[in-house]
């Protein structure tokens, strides 16, 4: 965050008003991103956060409120993806994956962070969609728009 804060004043006003910062599972998480919220809009990537911490952050979490506030009146965006379906082959589609249990079973975070083709886990979809009243959800998947359409259609049944 310090490097970004250092260069931020040298950016044009147009650049300062369009840059967003996203948490990730390697460089920095939500707490480090929040150090930038007074200058830049923050994008919450809920999958990155889960991979980094094992936590299913909730829309009522104070950190998410601070992320929303960083958008200064504009509807925020969150990023949503789920671990690949060919990694969690036997996982129940109606159960949230438990990071501690997966690690105990020998799964590696590097594999769990890879994006799936589609949003195959109903429980994870329900969790992600709990943010929909507050933020736009950008689906990150291998099937791109097809995955977004299928997710949207699943909410209208």
What are these regions (language model features)?
Residues 26-28, 47-53:
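Short acidic, Gly/Ser-rich segments with clustered Asp/Glu that frequently serve as metal-coordination loops
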Residues 40, 51-157:
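Histidine-acidic metal/acid-base catalytic patches
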